[in-house]
Amino acid sequence: MTHIEIDGVPPAPDQLWAAVSAYGHFTAMQVRNGKTRGVALHMRRLEAANREALGVGLDGERVRALIRHALGETKDASVRVYVFEAPGEPAIMVTVKAPAEMATPQRLQSAHYQRPDAHIKHVTTDQGHYRRHAQRNGFDDAILVSPPGVVSESTLANIGFFDGSAVVWPDAPMLHGITMQLLEGELARRGLPSRRSTVRVRDIASLDGAFLCSARGIAAVTTVDHMSLPVESQGLSTLAKAYASVTWDSI
């Protein structure tokens, strides 16, 4: 069951309708034992998106207090924080659901679509459309590509690749995800470099593997369209160890 609070209280039906139909942005996190990974990065994301989308700052300490209030005694959960346009000042909705992990491995189908304002985490129906279309075709998710075939991200996660010496992130409009940011730091400390480069769908078969990463974790990618990818590699092993070493922060 999902627990929802808006500005610290259960919403009235009209408030809930306003929340799901209003202009805004959000962040998503997994909570374990009352902690989450990259809490400062989540607050920074919300602050930056709020200034760009809604024109005002956002008090990160208040957001954290609202998350703690919505969690109550719940220690493990999937949490989303939505900030949306409302009379006076932006409203903050926190949703609390059962904890979740990303299914692995993942099979992806390419879809020609580019999220508008891709650097902001916002809700669009188009992403869900392409994800459902891929699932109807026997895949787990869709990988978003521009008309020239340049890869950006999946509908729900960042995608990365291995080229034998480094982790390659797509050089394309995309969300700089929290898990991606955490991995970049951990990989650098472990001596595995990461870089941005243009990746086209036709190039994927020549790479040494691929993975998805989001708040729900990391998953190897075994298939993109008709192409099979290796899933046993030193890169994936290093990636898993790096992710496991990321500290959990008190909310």
List each language-model region with its residue ranges.
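Helix-start/capping segments and mature chain N-termini
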Residues: 1-69, 84-251
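Phosphate/pyrophosphate-binding loop motifs in nucleotide- or prenyl diphosphate-using proteins
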Residues: 81
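Short secondary-structure junctions
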Residues: 71-78, 137
